[in-house]
Swiss-Prot record:
It is an enzyme of class 4 (lyase). This is 2-C-methyl-D-erythritol 2,4-cyclodiphosphate synthase. 4-CDP-2-C-methyl-D-erythritol 2-phosphate binds at D23, S24, H25, T149, S150, G151, E152. Pathway: Isoprenoid biosynthesis; isopentenyl diphosphate biosynthesis via DXP pathway; isopentenyl diphosphate from 1-deoxy-D-xylulose 5-phosphate: step 4/6. It comes from Chlamydia caviae (strain ATCC VR-813 / DSM 19441 / 03DC25 / GPIC) (Chlamydophila caviae). The keyword Lyase applies. Homotrimer. Binds 1 divalent metal cation per subunit.
């Protein structure tokens, strides 16, 4: 008996797995030319993040949430290898690798994102961010939820030193 997958309960046609992911990065100096990218969307008038990659904390948090379901570490393993061997810094490539780690009978059915940071101003770009996430994950726009908070100065993120993101996603898995 495989303790991880066997259960005395009847096997349902669909099971649902929930993944959670987090990521955060500190801003570079204001004089940095590196763009600030969140969910694949460029935020003008804000410096980029201290990171080997483009620092897209939203895509990174989604990668980590997928990894919590698939048990394949993308950030820290796959992404590091892509960076060190091929110079790839685009977080959408890392997210594609995370999606490929899902089994053929698994699909992402919903994702919820929450972002904390005093800057940049998220509200004007939340719609574009939702669309970018839906496109990257190949799910309907209605299956993407996103919220943002300034943090009210209560943490380093709320004081404007960086940005933090949490992601919860649901993976539907078809059982034969």
């Amino acid at each position: 008996m495989d303790a991880e997958n066997d259960s005395p309960l009847p096997k349902p046609q669909w099971i649902y797995r929930v993944g959670i992911g987090q990521d955060s990065h500190r801003f570079l100096s204001e004089s940095s030319a590196k763009p600030c990218i969140l969910a694949g969307v460029i935020f003008e008038n804000s410096p980029g993040f201290q990171a080997n990659s483009d620092g897209d904390i939203v895509f990174h948090a989604i990668c980590n949430a997928i990894s919590s379901v698939t048990h394949r570490i993308i950030l820290g393993e796959v992404a590091d290898e892509l960076f060190h061997t091929r110079g790839i810094t685009d977080s959408s490539v890392y997210l594609s690798e995370a999606i490929k780690s899902l089994k053929s009978n698994q699909m992402i059915s919903h994702v919820a994102i929450t972002i904390e940071g005093n800057r940049p101003k998220f509200l004007p770009k939340l719609s574009a961010m939702r669309q970018s996430i839906a496109s990257a994950l190949n799910i309907p726009l209605g299956s993407v939820g996103i919220t943002a908070t300034s943090g009210e100065g209560l943490s380093d993120f709320g004081c404007g030193d960086g940005v933090q993101c949490f992601c919860v996603l649901t993976v539907a898995e078809y059982c034969n």
